[in-house]
Amino acid sequence: PDDGETVYPDDDWVEDMDMTTSLRFYAEKLGKNIGVAAASYRYDFSQTNGEIGLVGEEFNMIVGENEMKFDATEPNQGEFNYGGSDAILWLSDRYEQVVRGHTLAWHQQVPSWVSSDGKKNNNNFSKRQLLDILKNHIFNVVGRYKGKITEWDVCNEVLDDDQSIVRSDPTAYKLRPSIWATYIGEEFIDSAFVWAHQADPDAKLYINEYGAEMVGKTKTEAYYNLVKRLKESGLAIEGCGLQCHFTTGELDTMKLEKNIRRYDNLGLKCIITELDIALADPTAEDALERQAKEYGAITRIFLRNENCSSMLVWGISDNHSWRKNAPLLFNHELKAKPAYYNVHAQLRKAVEQLSTGLESPKTDGKPSARLLRTVYYNIMGQEMTSPTGFRIERRFYDDGSIETIKTYK
């Protein structure tokens, strides 16, 4: 369920079905990034329609689905292959998009010369050798795209799924077994951030995780503990990513938003990096409507939290998703689904509110009045000095008019 405390009316995207404006049109007006995971190997770069067209028309941020992972960029030790990652950069130039790099240190899609399964140390590398391998990889890959890739997922999915340790120690977390964690130790995370920052001091650095989206889960708490530790260690960490691979019926918007906001209290961004929402029951009559409502609810959270600067969906169309049961915004024929139209509607309404809320509502033909000051009140009518959450705004204009609105931030 949505939290019920939103400035937007109930999900109503009917009028958006006749609109030709893109998602990025509104996102850019709001200073937000709406992004997509692209698979460059599927595209005909001579074309501008179809899936490649949607990638550029609808989204102002792009991330390679697989192109920048370890096995793709360094298939053999010291031999780097940038064909796929360069293709993502080419697309970003063509469509004027911000680029996310994904990912530098992960337990999956590790080349066989490092590990046969991401866990085994088949070649009996020493700790020092593994650190050198990781360092060389990061300096080469990040260095190649210095000044071109805006932000990187430095480490991906480092936590074990079993975080029962949090129940006995609320500040604890447990790393998953991997070639990096088992044979180097936790310092591989810190080292990776240090090296990525050295390779490109201007790049924004993130850690990324799944299953840690909503407060109350042990993995969510463990992730918070780890991210807090990294921040307090003085590392150049911009924020954390929540993958948000959901199935309809799983989402609790209040718990998701509470999680995002507590990272803001740490001075960190908390962004949505791999959003998709699979249908719990594709045969249900209201399956697509339920999916649309959840996409809309997440979009509202994205829009009203300043530290959630980006929201990326993990793919374009249902037939090319890594998941079953139609989790994306476009169907197998590249037709927009209700989920797309509700994301569009929430972006549009946010822009409309932004553009109309800064002027006097008077329509008597006089020039718009200038806003003098805004006073915020909580739901009890008490003035707020640092407004967050549900609030009432009273806007005072130089023509004597006063506008009172309810909003959520």
Where are these regions (language model features)?
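Short, acidic/polar
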Residues: 40-57, 132-141, 218-230, 256-259, ...
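Aromatic-rich peripheral "rim/lid" segments of glycoside hydrolase catalytic domains that contact
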Residues: 18-22, 112, 144, 153, ...
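C-terminal tail/sorting-segment detector
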Residues: 391-409
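Residue-level detector of functionally pivotal "anchor" positions at catalytic/ligand-binding pockets or at interdomain
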Residues: 2-7, 352-383
